[in-house]
């Protein structure tokens, strides 16, 4: 009996209890919640259903809890149901009913934990979207890990997800990048507002290798040559770094295309039709204050140049025209003001602001020997994705960045995350998978085969704890997807790995010496197979490997 099965049973039982007493069943919530008590002595699961419903139907919650407990006790699969406190019901599940979770996991395999909770959603997930003016910095690396994991997580719940990178190749930052490349190619110092780092010299040299006469061209042609070739080279490096990090995108959209394709003009025309545009001081303004923004925004400057928001408006309209019903933007801490701005822009275009969802990520700091690490040899100023991977590897880098809520600043201790110790969270989880894999190999050598026919033999308290936690995996995925919080998967896996290690230390899985394999060995091996599957499924969502050996 999974937690979902138990929730359904509770609702069915509550419906019968209320109907029998001529009480209004409409008071029942659409979804009944069951939780695992903090103190296992209180039972396997608990529900506050009587507290939710009692007052609505005019019955003391504790009395209603008593009716529910009495009915549940007489139900197959329920070992006991007891009233606690003002109206809680603590439940114990019969081992035979609880242990079917193991068989469900083995049967479902890679799809265990998947659901159709988001099957109707068509989601555009935009993340990283770093300017092609330098390597991915550590903040962008956090989004590369979290965004990719979130995309995988949403897909497990049935959503159609398109991962998109908005390629900012329009504006002043590109002009500064080009000036920096030209200065490097000429052997001149970096411009005051330019980009430093050895990568600038490398790209400048590659531009000259592709077009040896670039520096001899007229100024405008020279700048365009360095722009076209340099931006392509930089973006190729970014794509390779992201791919090596395990993050790939379905779509790359160029900001410049919003301006050259007429998309900006189309968006402004739509806004004019909606009465959301006005002219003042020679500029074109958007009435975003009518839709919750703190001030109106300039769309076209007085010199005729489009403001940055013009591209945002065109890009959002483009996404909606491609059929997305939810557009998730993952932005850095310095973009907090974009939340109201983007939602107001959606409303001004005549759309539902809830089609826009903005996630703001906080800072990432690296620490070595208790001291902050601030400089990158390649980038010159900031720590990059490549720096982090070189220091601790892809798996540890991804896990360390996903493990905390994005609205929390994080410090990554390079010594900790590169260590082979239980204090290293990713090592702890991966070691559990490797240990389970070794167990499977040893079982094969001994001729022991996992069998779910005798799961009723799994009665040890450590077995029960492990099985109940395995049953939580679908709920963890559903809630993590709904809340856009992939870090919940990390915390769950660490908890599950701990339950497995404690089970392994208390319950011998394989026969020893001349002992013949028995039904208990086979049942425990099935439990281990299920545990290994869930850990592998969770790590796959995070984009972290599940090693067979360590």
UniProtKB/Swiss-Prot annotation:
Main location: cytoplasm
Motif ('HIGH' region): 130-140
Key words, A-Z: Aminoacyl-tRNA synthetase, ATP-binding, Cytoplasm, Ligase, Nucleotide-binding, Protein biosynthesis
Residue stretches in coiled coil: none
Any single Gene Ontology cellular-component annotation: cytoplasm
UniProt GO MF annotations: arginine-tRNA ligase activity; ATP binding
The reaction(s) this protein catalyses: tRNA(Arg) + L-arginine + ATP = L-arginyl-tRNA(Arg) + AMP + diphosphate
Keyword Nucleotide-binding: yes
Main EC class the enzyme belongs to: ligase
Family listed: Belongs to the class-I aminoacyl-tRNA synthetase family.
Protein name (record): Arginine--tRNA ligase
């Amino acid at each position: 009996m999974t937690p979902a099965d138990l929730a359904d049973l509770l609702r069915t039982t509550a419906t019968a209890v209320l109907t029998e007493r001529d009480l209004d069943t409409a008071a029942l919530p659409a979804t009944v919640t069951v939780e695992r008590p903090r103190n296992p002595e209180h039972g396997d699961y608990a529900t506050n259903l009587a507290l939710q419903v009692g007052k609505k139907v005019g019955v003391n919650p504790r009395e209603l809890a008593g009716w529910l407990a009495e009915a549940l006790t007489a139900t197959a699969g329920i070992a006991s149901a007891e009233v606690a406190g003002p109206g809680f019901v603590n439940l114990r599940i019969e081992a035979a009913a609880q242990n079917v979770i193991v068989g469900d996991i083995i049967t479902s395999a890679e799809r265990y934990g998947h659901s159709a909770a988001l099957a109707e959603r068509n989601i555009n997930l935009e993340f990283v979207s770093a300017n092609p003016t330098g390597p991915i910095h550590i903040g962008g690396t956090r989004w590369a890990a979290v965004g990719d994991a979130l995309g995988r997580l949403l897909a497990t719940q049935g959503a159609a997800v398109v991962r998109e990178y908005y390629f900012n190749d329009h504006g002043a930052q590109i002009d500064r990048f080009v000036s920096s490349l030209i200065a490097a190619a000429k052997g001149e110092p970096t411009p005051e507002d330019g980009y430093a780092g050895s990568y600038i010299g490398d790209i400048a040299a590659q531009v000259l290798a592709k077009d040896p006469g670039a520096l001899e061209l007229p100024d405008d042609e020279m700048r365009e040559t360095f722009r076209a070739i340099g931006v392509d080279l930089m973006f190729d490096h970014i794509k390779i770094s992201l791919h090596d990090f395990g993050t790939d995108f379905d779509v790359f959209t160029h900001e410049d295309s919003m301006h050259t394709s007429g998309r900006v003009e189309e968006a402004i025309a739509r806004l004019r039709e909606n009465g959301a545009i006005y002219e003042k001081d020679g500029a074109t303004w958007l009435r975003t204050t009518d839709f919750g923004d703190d001030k109106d925004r300039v769309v076209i400057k007085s010199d005729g140049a489009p403001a940055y928001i013009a591209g945002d408006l065109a890009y959002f309209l483009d996404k909606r025209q491609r059929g997305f019903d939810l557009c998730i933007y993952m932005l850095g801490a310095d973009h907090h003001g974009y939340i109201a701005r983007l939602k107001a822009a959606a409303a001004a275009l005549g759309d539902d602001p809830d089609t826009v969802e903005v996630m703001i990520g906080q800072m990432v700091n690296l620490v070595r020997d208790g001291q902050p690490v601030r400089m990158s040899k390649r980038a010159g100023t900031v720590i990059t994705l490549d720096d982090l991977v070189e220091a601790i590897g892809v798996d540890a880098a991804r896990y360390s960045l996903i493990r905390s809520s994005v609205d929390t600043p994080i410090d990554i201790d390079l010594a900790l995350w590169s260590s082979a110790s239980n204090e290293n969270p990713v090592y702890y989880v991966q070691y559990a998978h490797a240990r389970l894999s070794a167990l499977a190999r040893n079982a094969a050598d001994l001729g022991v085969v996992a069998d779910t026919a005798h799961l009723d033999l799994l009665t040890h308290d450590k077995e029960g704890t492990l099985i109940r936690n395995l049953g939580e995996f679908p709920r963890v995925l559903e809630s993590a997807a709904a809340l856009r919080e992939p870090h919940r998967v990390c915390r769950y896996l660490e908890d599950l790995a701990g339950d497995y290690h404690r089970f392994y230390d208390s319950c011998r899985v394989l026969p020893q010496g001349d002992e013949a394999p028995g039904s208990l060995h086979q049942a425990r091996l099935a439990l281990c197979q299920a545990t290994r599957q869930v850990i592998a499924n969770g790590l796959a969502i995070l984009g972290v490997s599940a090693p067979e050996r360590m």
